[in-house]
């Protein structure tokens, strides 16, 4: 796992087309913004796991991505 430190307003790049920007920090919550092409799905982990469970994907039951 790559671990990075970013301040509010700073961005990181994932590949050439995905950016993740720190929008704010309040207590233990961090607001981030993600810009990605339409064909790239972006979900919170709990939503992704629910989608995988509905599909019957084995990774969902094991917690593997």
Curated annotation (Swiss-Prot):
GO terms for biological process: mRNA catabolic process; negative regulation of translational initiation; positive regulation of translational initiation; regulation of carbohydrate metabolic process. GO terms for molecular function: mRNA 5'-UTR binding. The keyword Cytoplasm applies. InterPro entries: CsrA, CsrA_sf. Coiled coil: none annotated. Gene3D superfamilies: Translational regulator CsrA. GO terms for cellular component: cytosol. Keywords: Activator, Cytoplasm, Repressor, RNA-binding, Translation regulation. It is found in: Cytoplasm. Belongs to the CsrA/RsmA family. This is Translational regulator CsrA. It comes from Aliivibrio fischeri (strain ATCC 700601 / ES114).
């Amino acid at each position: 796992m790559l671990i990075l430190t970013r301040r509010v307003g700073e961005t990181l790049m994932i590949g050439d087309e995905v950016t993740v920007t720190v929008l704010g920090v309040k207590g233990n919550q961090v607001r981030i913004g993600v810009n990605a092409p339409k064909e790239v799905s972006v979900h919170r982990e709990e939503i992704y796991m629910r989608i995988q469970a509905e599909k019957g994907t084995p990774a969902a039951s094991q917690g593997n991505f």
